[in-house]
Amino acid sequence: MTSGKVLSLYMTMPDMMRSGHRMKVEDIECDANGIIGSRDYENDTERPMVLVSKKSYDIIEEAELFFERGLLMEDIYVDVDLYHLKKGSIIEIGDMIFEVTGACEDYRYLYAFAPELPELIKGNRGLFITPIEYGRIEVGDEVNVIKEA
């Protein structure tokens, strides 16, 4: 069984604060409406969360590019490579259970940071995950693969 730890968590701030600003947080709580307190909470659209592995930033840094964590729009940043997981795989993080819904393959905005960045991390951009059991995640929580599809 693959396991690791949560290195950092991010949330997109709501309109009343700094709309669209990505903020590093120590914990997040989720329910059926999404990440409590985020801009997209209760917006009636399906918003999967983005999980990014340290592997993505390692690839970027090996190419001598250096960016702050959070650039890849991750909600959850972990130390374990989970990019082998397919749609339908199940991951436990903190109190929560997630289903992998697919690979995150949106690279368009990354061209603004470095033209080579999208090609560099192709296939290693992140995973879309959807909560199926709700609760809380904190930095340092364990990440465990429960089932591989």
Which residues does each predicted region cover?
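Short, well-ordered loop/turn sites that connect or cap secondary structure elements
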Residues: 85, 91-92, 136-138, 143
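Electropositive, beta-rich accessory/interaction domains or terminal extensions
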Residues: 1-103, 148
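A short, acidic, flexible beta-alpha connecting loop/helix-capping segment that sits on the rim
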Residues: 133-136, 148-149
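A structural micro-motif recognizing beta-strand termini
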Residues: 79-81, 130-134
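Short, surface-exposed beta-strand-loop junctions and turns on beta-sheet-rich folds
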Residues: 106-107
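Active-site scaffold segments
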Residues: 97-102, 119-131
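Short, electropositive, low-hydrophobicity segments enriched in small/polar residues
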Residues: 38-41, 130, 139
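Short, basic/aromatic beta-hairpin or loop at an interaction surface
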Residues: 63-75, 111-126
